[in-house]
Every structure is written in C-alpha cells, then in structure tokens.
C-alpha cells in the first residue's frame, strides 16, 4: 500500500399521596358555603396520618403505597378491567379519586357544564391559571354543543358572559365568535378536518383536562405504561452492548446485553479483489455491498436473505485505483471515483457504465450524489467543487480562494448543506440556500468524515489517531472522542452503525477493526483477522449484526454474531474465482 505525505491532503490516506387524594376521605362531601378554596388547598397539602399515607413499599423506601395502588387501579380501568379496578379500590381502601373529583369527572362525561365548572372551583387548586384554562375548556365544549344543536343565543351568552370574562385565549374567543355567523359550516369544518375531534367529544375534554390539572388529582391514563417504558429505555440506553430492537426488551428481568450482540465473528471472507481494498459501502436497502480497490476495479456484491454474500458484478474501466464507490439514493446506481482520473456512473442491475464525468485539465478526488439522485458533486484537483446533472451538464462550479483541495465531500438529505473537507484541518458546512458557511476547525489534519443518518452529527477522522463526533445542529460542537485505533500514514475511514447508530466502528493500521459505544466513548471490542491495514468499514443499515471491513490484504471480511458464524461454518468462504459474477467493462461516454 502506498504512503502519502502527511503534508499533502491525501487521496486514500495521510489514510409523588394521601390514601385519599387531596386529603378528602372516600365518603366525604364538600359544600362550597362551608369550606373555602384555601382551606381545601390546605387539606390537599396535609395528608391524614390515619390513612397510612407515609407507608412505602420497595427495598429503597421511595415508593408511596397509596400512589402505587392508584396507578395500578388507573391502569386497570384504562385496560378495560373495570370490575377488577373497582375491586382493588374496595379491597385496598385506597380510592382512585375522592368523591369530589369523581363528581367532577362524571359531570364532564354527562355534559353538565355549569355544575362541572362550579365543582372545579370547589376543589381548590392552588394554580389559578390552570383553573382558568380548565374552566375555558369546559365552557368551550358547552359553547360547541349549543352551536351543534343551533342554540345560537345560548352559545352567544356562554361566549360573552362566561368565556370572555376569563380574559384568556382571546384568539380562540374571536374564532368562536366568528362561528356564530355560519354555525353549520363551522361545525362541518371542525368535524371533517383530519386530526380534529368531534365537537361533542367529551372524552377529548377529559384527556385535555389531564394536561391542565395536577397529576395527583387526575392521574394520567397511561401513567403506569409511561413509568415502565421509561425504565426500559433507561436500561437500554445504559447498556453499552445493546444492539437489538426494542421489541426484544422484557419486563421479566433487568435488561443487559452482552458482547454477543456485537458483530465480532468472521462470517465470510470475500477475495475477488487482486490488490488493496480501499473503500466499501452497504446499499441503503441493505441488499448489496459495493467495494473499490487499488486494482482499478469496483465490485458489487449481492446479499441473500440468509446473509450470504456473493459477487454480482465486477466493474472494469478505470485506469487508476478506484478510491471510492457510492450508492445512489434509490440504490439503482453507483458512482466510482478514480484517483485523480474520472467519475463513472454504473447501473446496478446490468453492471453497465452509463456515463463518465470529467472536466478538461483537472481531475476529481472525491464525489457524491445529490439527495434526489439527479445530480453529481465532486471535489477537484484545482480546488474547485463542481456539480453536474446526470447527463454531465455542469450546473455549478465554485472556484478561487474560497475553496481548497477538497478530499471528501457530501450533501445532507434535504439538499441544504454541502459538507466538505476544504483545508487540511477544516470542514466546511455550506448553506446552499442562505449562501453562508460554517466551519469546523480541528487541531490536526482531517483524513475523512462520515455523516450520521439524521444528518445531525459528523464523525471526523484525524491524523493524530483520534476520531471526533461533532453535533452540527446550530453551532458545531464536539460531543465525543474515540481513541485506541492506530493511524500514522494512511486514510482510515470510520462509520456509524448498529441499533439507532449507537456504535462507532473504524479500521486501523494494526490490521484490526475497532468498535466503540457512541454515547460513552468506551472501546468495547477489537476484531483481529486481517493481515494488513483496515482502510474502511461499513455497517449494514438493515442488519444490525452485519459489519464489513476492507483491508490492504486484498480481502473484505464480513463480521456477524456467533450464531451466524455457526450457521455458516460448513459453508465455503466466498471465493472470487468460484463466483458466478460477471466482469463489466465501461463503455460510457
């Protein structure tokens, strides 16, 4: 493998209640004439010791039994187990809601809006804004129900005498006032617009009340589910080896994966290239793998349903090493970039070269696709960035002092940002719409970069044997660093991968593949096997347990789980000479 001077931009390298909520007993009643809101608020704030409010369960003593039972009761009702929920309330002596809250909720269900507003104020919530918002919600439903049965005078009185005096949500008051001009049209629009609830949907009112009133008063319907999901997600996120779908999480035991979830066993060795393999990339649909080599060829590999990989096409036509091969957004075509030579576009199905892109007197050293697949971008040897349509017509070409020798280039999925290595230690983020540029300035030479699937992060490989993860939303900032791999002379490429791209993988000059946990930066596994520097790695976007690595030893290793290796141990490793793949020569113009 050739050595590149570190002083030059490289081609391949320089490489929380009382037992009875709110202090009310289950059989108590509250009269507005004898108890004011402040005293009720005090009752809410002071639990009754006789009810055992301070009793806790669990080994750590942080779970109040009354809250725990109420949440279970709420979940039972939500699941439709009404009899079981009622039995739990009776047996435990812990009511889901006190009598006043029960009365309030029933009044809402029955559409007794005046009574429900009065009961709301009797409860004595300390947050006046929340009470006003809840009152507005109840009165709005009252207004809409009058409107639906064409009781226009009653609707107007509700709006003028009850809602407007609250002095909140003025815009909505004006909208409702306008509806009095043509009630039927308003009702029709409200009930027929996608995503809108029917105007008489009292259940919707109850749902919205949950967002306005304290959870200690009206326990959210899905509270238990929310707690359980949060617990599972925390367990998942703290597991550095987690590399399975959420459907595999279980409530029966604490979640903890092992290294067996990380692709760490050689499943196949692909040996069709005759020289160093410099680049490889899985297709977006995960059905293919493409590789390029110093041997001046590129190969398209096909992946079967069981994960076995076989040669599909060998792409011949370049007269210099092929430094990169990139998939079109629809995976129907690939681009290959010859080292300071030409860019060629190939059809995946046939293996034919359908077009060649070049510019007189200068050559490409990097290339990429437009996100819609209808154009090509390239960094050129004369420090310019050129863009062509598929037919080779030049669309844009930036020249001059603004650009440097561009050794890596990409465009975000929305087509807004053009990302390129524009100087030895600088990455340019150019906003094509606003024509403004942001820069990521590193402390050492940048050898390559990779964008995350969501285009919010960029992984940067540096000459000093460090990989840095930058958040590029807003002002760019470093969020993590990865160390351990070896790099001194060559371009080494890294990638995101695994479940929700939770891992970082990289090649290394010591012939190993390195994998880190993305969030913590912890090195979790080193994969030996290659006999030469590992130049590039790619993680399948559809198979969480498939990783590919390209090496100077002329081979591509496919890494999988232990069980995958066992399933394939009797199968012969893929040999280029025994493949049925076809060699294609480029006749593109």
From Swiss-Prot:
SUPFAM superfamilies in the cross-refs: WD40 repeat-like (SSF50978)
Extent of Low complexity compositional bias: 25-39
Coiled-coil residue windows: none
Role of this protein: Acts as a component involved in the crosstalk regulation between light, hormone and abiotic stress response.
GO BP field: leaf senescence; response to abscisic acid; response to absence of light; response to auxin; response to ethylene; response to light stimulus; response to osmotic stress
Summary of subunit composition and partner proteins: Interacts with RANBPM.
UniProt region (Disordered), positions on chain: 1-57
GO cellular component, one term: nucleus
Domain LisH per the UniProt entry, residue ranges: 64-96
The organism of origin for this protein: Arabidopsis thaliana
Induction of the gene: Induced by auxin, abscisic acid (ABA), ethylene, mannitol and salt stress. Down-regulated by dark.
WD-type repeats, residues: 272-311, 317-358, 360-398, 401-440, 442-480, 484-526, 529-569
Family matches, as PROSITE patterns: CTLH (PS50897), LISH (PS50896), WD_REPEATS_1 (PS00678), WD_REPEATS_2 (PS50082), WD_REPEATS_REGION (PS50294)
Domain (CTLH): residue spans on this chain: 97-154
Superkingdom to which the source organism belongs: Eukaryota
Gene that encodes it: WDR26
Name of the protein described by the UniProt record: WD repeat-containing protein 26 homolog
Predominant location category: cytoplasm
């Amino acid at each position: 493998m050739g050595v590149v001077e570190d002083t030059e931009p490289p081609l391949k390298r320089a490489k929380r209640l009382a037992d009875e909520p709110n202090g009310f007993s289950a059989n108590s009643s509250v009269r507005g004439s004898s108890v004011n809101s402040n005293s009720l608020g005090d009752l809410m704030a002071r639990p009754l010791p006789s009810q055992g409010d301070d009793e806790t369960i669990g080994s750590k003593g942080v779970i109040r039994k009354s809250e725990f039972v109420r949440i279970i009761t709420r979940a039972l009702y939500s699941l439709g187990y009404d009899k079981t929920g009622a039995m739990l309330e009776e047996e435990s002596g812990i009511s889901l809601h006190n009598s006043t809250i029960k009365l309030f909720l029933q009044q809402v269900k029955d559409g007794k809006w005046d009574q429900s507003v009065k009961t709301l104020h009797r409860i004595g919530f300390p947050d006046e804004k929340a009470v006003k918002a809840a009152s507005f919600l109840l009165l709005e439903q009252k207004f809409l129900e009058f409107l639906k049965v064409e009781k226009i005078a009653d609707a107007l009185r509700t709006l003028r005498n009850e809602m407007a005096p609250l002095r909140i949500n003025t815009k909505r008051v004006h909208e409702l006032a306008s509806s009095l001009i043509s009630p039927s049209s308003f009702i029709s629009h409200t009930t027929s617009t996608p995503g809108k609830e029917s105007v008489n949907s009292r259940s919707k009112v109850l749902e919205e009340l949950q967002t306005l009133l304290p959870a200690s008063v009206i326990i959210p319907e899905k509270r238990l589910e929310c707690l359980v999901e949060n617990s599972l997600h925390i367990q998942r996120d703290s597991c550095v080896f987690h590399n399975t779908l959420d459907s595999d999480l279980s409530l029966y035991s604490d979640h903890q994966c092992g290294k067996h979830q990380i692709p760490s066993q050689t499943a196949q060795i692909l040996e069709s290239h005759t020289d160093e393999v410099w680049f490889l990339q899985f297709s977006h649909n995960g059905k293919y793998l493409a590789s390029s080599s110093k041997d001046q060829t590129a190969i398209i590999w096909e992946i079967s349903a069981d994960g076995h990989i076989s040669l599909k096409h060998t792409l011949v036509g370049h007269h210099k090493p092929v430094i990169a091969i990139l998939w079109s957004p629809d995976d129907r075509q690939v681009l290959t970039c010859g080292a300071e030579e030409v860019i060629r576009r190939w059809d995946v199905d046939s293996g034919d070269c359908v077009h060649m892109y070049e510019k007189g007197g200068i050559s490409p050293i990097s290339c990429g696709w437009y996100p819609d697949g209808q154009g090509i971008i390239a960094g050129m040897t004369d420090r310019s960035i050129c863009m062509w349509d598929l037919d080779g017509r030049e669309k844009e070409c930036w020249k001059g002092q603004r650009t440097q020798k561009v050794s890596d280039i990409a465009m975000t999925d929305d087509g807004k940002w053009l990302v390129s290595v524009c100087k030895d230690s600088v990455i340019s983020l150019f906003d094509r719409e606003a024509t403004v540029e942001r820069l990521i300035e590193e402390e050492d030479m940048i050898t390559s970069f990779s964008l995350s699937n969501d285009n919010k992060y960029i992984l940067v490989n540096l000459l000093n044997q460090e990989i840095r993860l930058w958040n590029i939303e807003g002002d760019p900032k470093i969020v993590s660093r990865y160390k351990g791999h070896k790099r001194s002379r060559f371009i080494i490429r890294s990638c995101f991968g695994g479940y929700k791209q939770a891992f970082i993988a990289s090649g290394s000059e010591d012939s190993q593949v390195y994998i880190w946990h993305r969030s913590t930066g912890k090195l979790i596994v080193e994969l030996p096997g290659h006999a030469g520097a590992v130049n590039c790695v790619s993680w399948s976007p559809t198979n969480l347990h498939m990783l590919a690595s390209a090496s100077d030893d002329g081979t591509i290793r496919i890494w999988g789980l232990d069980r995958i290796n066992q399933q394939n141990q009797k199968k012969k490793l893929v040999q280029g000479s025994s493949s049925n793949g076809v060699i294609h020569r480029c006749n593109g113009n």
